[in-house]
Structures are given as structure tokens and as C-alpha cells.
Curated annotation (Swiss-Prot):
<dbReference type="InterPro" id="IPR005116">
    <property type="entry name" value="Transp-assoc_OB_typ1"/>
</dbReference>
<feature type="binding site">
    <location>
        <begin position="32"/>
        <end position="39"/>
    </location>
    <ligand>
        <name>ATP</name>
    </ligand>
</feature>
<comment type="function">
    <text>Part of the ABC transporter complex ModABC involved in molybdenum import. Responsible for energy coupling to the transport system.</text>
</comment>
<keyword id="KW-0547">Nucleotide-binding</keyword>
<dbReference type="GO" id="GO:0015412">
    <property type="term" value="F:ABC-type molybdate transporter activity"/>
</dbReference>
<dbReference type="GO" id="GO:0005886">
    <property type="term" value="C:plasma membrane"/>
</dbReference>
<dbReference type="InterPro" id="IPR017871">
    <property type="entry name" value="ABC_transporter-like_CS"/>
</dbReference>
<dbReference type="InterPro" id="IPR004606">
    <property type="entry name" value="Mop_domain"/>
</dbReference>
<protein>
    <recommendedName>
        <fullName>Molybdenum import ATP-binding protein ModC</fullName>
        <ecNumber>7.3.2.5</ecNumber>
    </recommendedName>
</protein>
<dbReference type="Pfam" id="PF00005">
    <property type="entry name" value="ABC_tran"/>
</dbReference>
<comment type="subunit">
    <text>The complex is composed of two ATP-binding proteins (ModC), two transmembrane proteins (ModB) and a solute-binding protein (ModA).</text>
</comment>
<feature type="domain" description="Mop">
    <location>
        <begin position="290"/>
        <end position="352"/>
    </location>
</feature>
<dbReference type="GO" id="GO:0016887">
    <property type="term" value="F:ATP hydrolysis activity"/>
</dbReference>
<dbReference type="InterPro" id="IPR011868">
    <property type="entry name" value="ModC_ABC_ATP-bd"/>
</dbReference>
<dbReference type="InterPro" id="IPR008995">
    <property type="entry name" value="Mo/tungstate-bd_C_term_dom"/>
</dbReference>
<keyword id="KW-1278">Translocase</keyword>
<keyword id="KW-0067">ATP-binding</keyword>
Length: 352
């Protein structure tokens, strides 16, 4: 299963030119600054707008092919769409909204989706009585119950306040693990990208600047505008190794070494995404005998980037890499050089 996109579309002064093959599972984040063509890209997939030229294929079906005069209507594409606003029917109950558009009602599947989204207690209520987060959960349920081959989500959290965003993010994380269809997710929020996206399409002025896993793209110069000024960081996906319930800590496997974080929910082997900022990493040439820092990992220097009165140091920890920011004074005193074995003292780890 996959989505193949090869289209051009003029949108006022912007020309959207996209050529992509998106995997048939997981969440692909569509990311970029405002006006880069994010929403237009998924509207082309949905059929709400048509390309000037090109084609889009979903699995073995051609959705549109301008050269061969093929154009399936939106309702023929078997694609679910969740908009920024829930767009529920006010005169239908929650159950009525959920059932709208179902071709063949399946009670078992209905119950599964309702439980997954935590909306069992809302079925008899009407949209006017729901919070913004509840409305969006109902909208997501309605889209899923149409049994789509793909789900499109256009900034579904943008109209919500922070508590509701956090609430719905937790449901979206759960959703991504439970359903077996690809999701295209438009956002301009780094937090949503970190929490949800397996892959990222970075759009810049209508063109695909990059398409890769979030972990790889985060290291790219293309993502520097979104990183904290003057600070480098590494985004890693690591499996849970074990838990220490006495100290309320969880060990993640980083190469062949352990990285301790605050206690997490999850079985051994579950993958967790983390971020390590360069300002939270210091360097020592020997293992400290007594220290409060729990994460001291051995590695090798692979890059030295002088910058003003500091040096950014990239350290390889097996196949993974992190950054440390040290003063020029410290770098000279330690005589840091590429290929040198060092110990990275990691003072803080952010779990996404």
C-alpha cells in the first residue's frame, strides 16, 4: 500500500509542484511555513481541488490522471478527511454523526472505534453540548467509520486550547498505533510533529524540500530555522530496555548503552522518541567517579563546529549521534579533535 503523487497546481502566485511516494502505514506529517502549500497538497489528494497536470495513485487505483482524463470525485476516492473545524451535523446526535456515510454498519467495528476514541458516553449528546476536543474526536470517528484507505487531517488541533490539544494528542497517538491505514497530517506545530509523525514532508514555496523520517530530517540544515537559536539538538527513537520502579526510571537502549529517563508507560521493546539538546550535554575525557548525572555515555567525536565563543561537538554513540555545546576555552583545554574518544554527560532528556 502506498500513495504516489506527481502533480503541479498554480495557486495564485504559488506553484505547487510535488512528486512523492508516501508509505502505506504510519503518520506522514506535512510541514512548512504558512502559505507553503500544505493544505492544498492534501486537498489535491482528497479531490477537493484538481491539479493542472499530473496524477495521483492510491494503492492500485488512479485517483486522478490529467493526461488520460481520469478524475474520481471525492466520494469515490475512499479517503477520510478531518478538517480544522469538526463540521458535525448539528441536528444529528453524536451517534447519528458517526453513522453518517457508513456504507455497511458493523457493530463490532463501531464499538471498537468508539472505545478507541473514548466517546462511548457522548453517543446520545448533540454537537452543541460538546467541547472542541470532543467534537474533533467525533469527527475522527466519523471519518474512520467510513472504512477509508487513507485518512487526511488538516491541522485538527489548531482551533483548540492547550488542555484540549493535549487531550486530543493522546488519542491521536493511540490511534496511530491501533489503525492500519496511512495518515497524512498537516501541521505547523513542532510539538505535534514530534509526538505523531513517522515521516515528514517539508514544503517550501510549493516544492518538496525534503521527505524522510523525522529523526533524519531534524539533523538536516533544512530544519535549522525551526531549532532553538544557537542550539543544536538530536531527535532519536529508542526502544525501552527495562524499568526501575524503585527509582521511577526507565532505561532506553542507545546503541549498546543505557539512557535513563523518567518512568514511562510501555512494555519493553516499545519505541520512544526523545530529544537531547546540545546545551544539556557536557564532555569529559574520563568517567567521573562520583556524580549526580545518571547518563554518562562513551562515544567518538565526528564533527567540530566553532561558533563564536563556543564549539558544537557531534558525538557518535554507536549508530546514533548527539550534539554537545562547549566553550572554546573548554574545547582548547580538553584538546578536542575529530576521532577522539570522549564521555558525554547528558544532564536532561526530553521525552516526546
Amino acid at each position: 500500500m502506498m500513495l504516489e503523487i506527481n502533480v503541479k497546481k498554480r495557486l495564485g502566485q504559488l506553484v505547487l509542484n510535488a512528486r512523492l511516494t508516501i508509505p502505506g502505514q504510519g503518520i506522514t506529517g506535512i510541514f512548512g511555513i504558512s502559505g507553503s502549500g500544505k493544505s492544498s497538497l492534501i486537498n489535491l489528494v482528497s479531490g477537493l481541488i484538481h491539479p493542472d497536470e499530473g496524477n495521483i495513485r492510491l494503492n492500485d487505483r488512479t485517483l486522478i490522471d490529467t493526461a488520460n482524463n481520469i478524475c474520481l470525485a471525492p466520494n469515490q476516492r475512499n479517503i477520510g478527511y478531518v478538517f480544522q473545524d469538526a463540521r458535525l451535523f448539528p441536528h444529528y446526535s453524536v451517534k447519528g454523526n458517526l453513522c453518517y456515510g457508513i456504507k455497511r454498519f458493523n457493530q463490532q467495528e463501531f464499538n471498537r472505534i468508539v472505545r478507541l476514541l473514548g466517546i462511548e458516553h457522548l453517543l446520545a449528546r448533540y454537537p452543541l453540548t460538546l467541547s472542541g476536543g470532543e467534537k474533533q474526536r467525533v469527527a475522527i470517528g466519523r471519518a474512520l467509520l467510513s472504512n477509508p484507505e487513507m485518512l487526511l487531517m488538516d491541522e485538527p488541533l489548531s482551533a483548540l486550547d492547550l488542555p484540549r490539544k493535549r487531550e486530543l494528542l493522546a488519542y491521536l497517538e493511540k490511534l496511530s498505533q491501533e489503525i492500519n491505514i496511512p495518515i497524512l497530517y498537516v501541521t505547523h506545530s513542532l510539538d505535534e510533529l514530534f509526538r505523531l509523525a513517522d515521516f515528514v514532508v517539508l514544503l517550501d514555496e510549493g516544492k518538496v524540500a525534503a521527505f524522510d523520517s523525522l529523526e533524519n530530517l531534524w539533523q538536516s540544515p533544512l530544519f535549522e530555522p525551526w531549532q532553538e537559536q544557537g542550539q543544536k539538538s538530536a531527535v532519536l527513537s529508542l526502544p525501552i530496555l527495562n524499568h526501575n520502579f524503585s527509582y521511577k526510571m526507565t532505561a532506553l537502549l542507545l546503541g549498546e548503552q543505557q539512557l535513563w529517563v523518567k518512568l514511562l508507560n510501555g512494555d519493553e521493546g516499545k519505541t520512544v522518541r526523545i530529544c537531547i539538546r546540545s546545551t544539556d550535554v557536557s564532555i569529559t575525557l574520563t568517567v567521573p567517579e562520583k556524580t549526580s548525572i545518571r547518563n554518562i555515555l562513551s562515544g567518538k567525536i565526528i564533527t567540530l563546529l566553532p561558533k563564536g565563543n563556543q564549539v558544537d561537538v557531534k558525538i557518535a554513540l554507536g549508530k546514533d549521534e548527539i550534539w554537545a555545546s562547549v566553550s572554546t576555552w573548554a574545547a582548547e583545554e580538553l584538546q578536542l579533535q575529530i576521532g577522539q574518544s570522549v564521555y558525554a554527560q547528558i544532564k536532561a532528556v526530553s521525552v516526546m
